[in-house]
Amino acid sequence: MKKARVFMVWLCMFLVLLVGCTGNQNTKSVSENKTEKEEVKEEVKEEVKQDVKEDVTITYLRPGTEVENNGELLQAINDKLKADGMNLKLEIMYIPSDVFQDKLNMMLSTGDEFDLLCIMEDQKPFTSFVANEGIIPITKYVEKSKNLNRVIPSYMWESATINGEIYTIPANWCETADQNCCITFRRDKMKEFGLEDPQTKEDLLNMCKIFAENWKGENKPVVIPMYKEPFNYLFRTLDTYPFTVQKDLFFIDQQGNVKNWMETEEFKQCAEFFRELYEKGYVPEDVLSSGWSSWKTMLTGDFIWVDQCQLWDTEAIWEERIPGVELDTIYLNPKAPIFRMASFRNDTAVSSTSKHPEEAVKFMDWLYSSQENYDLMVYGIEGVTWKNEGGNQYTKIDPAFEFNPDWMIGNLNYIRYQKGTYEKFIDIMGKEKPEAQNAIGLNFVFDPSAVADEYVTCQAEVVQSVYPIKLGLVSYEEGYKAALERMKAAGIDKVIEEYQKQMNEYLKQKGNK
């Protein structure tokens, strides 16, 4: 019995030791397993971290000044980019409009990094940026885009292409046919003075005379010339119309003949007309000074007419600016054909200093992928900066607010018009004109690289030598010879010759010659 009891004690001790050893082994094993799991977890985390791309910041360079709630608006765009899985962030760099081109040129020359560039064809065309290597080809990125090719017509892409390479993204924000071939005046004053709509140059001169004789107020009314662009509205009164004038350098008729604009009879007729306007006091004395502003002059209400369709904003806003005003826009010589001189007026290109050209184009594709994205970029935050009025109409909560205006980066597929916008503005700017006659070189793009120095010099010389004659400040008879000599010294003949050569090749490819 005693032996049996001893045996039982020994057996219990053995089992305890056995369980203890086994327990220790299990504890060690669990600990080891835990360590292995943690290691695996860390490896997975590292792999995920490597797979998640860091956001690329896209810097958009544009003229203008920052709006008050710019940070909030940008954050809304960036939040939407993140929600859409774009791995992109937008940053907007503003340069005051009056120094935009000078500052931009300096930034490009010093290699300052930015990605997207707002281009205004009336001030400096994208071809000039190509010539000085300020922008780069983006063909391979555009070809991958689903939305850019959907919302921008093929004829615009053709006009954005040089030697088979796309260099810029057109802003398809308006119909360009006859878009800048009209004038805007005060209909209220036309009624008051008993005037009919002008149709000829003589009618315009008479209109000026009647306005000046009957005007009440401290300041006399003036003509407001948008002189950095050709006076297309005036061309409609000439017998040889339609034709195209580009940059006050090139005259192109509908047969594809290219001439130095200032050497044409058409230039002479327009210059003599403006000389008469100037001598009679209808053109501002300081029109070429850096301080003169067409916009500020228009806001005074003391004007006879201003070039192009200027029915921007609503009728109510204009009534606040100029009490009693009734603006209207008309075409001279209504019998002249509807004419499309250019494919687009504004565009967005990728800077040669960009480190993220593909991502920059992806942002543009994202912008045009939905109404929501477009609204955020152009109008801001619904309920904060604008109110949806249904259809394609909206109301600005602050009438003076402007984020990234349609004319910079807009598209007809998404554009909204303020409630109360002039119907004529929508008719002129927003409705396609399939019956329009296209310029023979509509999709021709001049490549100035072979005459890059001469081309840049000629553009600068136009400002110094041609503008004063164009505006009538210097008479054609007195200024023409010296101005032409300076243009020829700048290399205009060589530039015209190269332009004609390329135009001939273009027309030959199209089967026109």
Regions found by a protein language model. Name each.
Residues 3, 10-513:
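Extracytoplasmic/secretory soluble proteins
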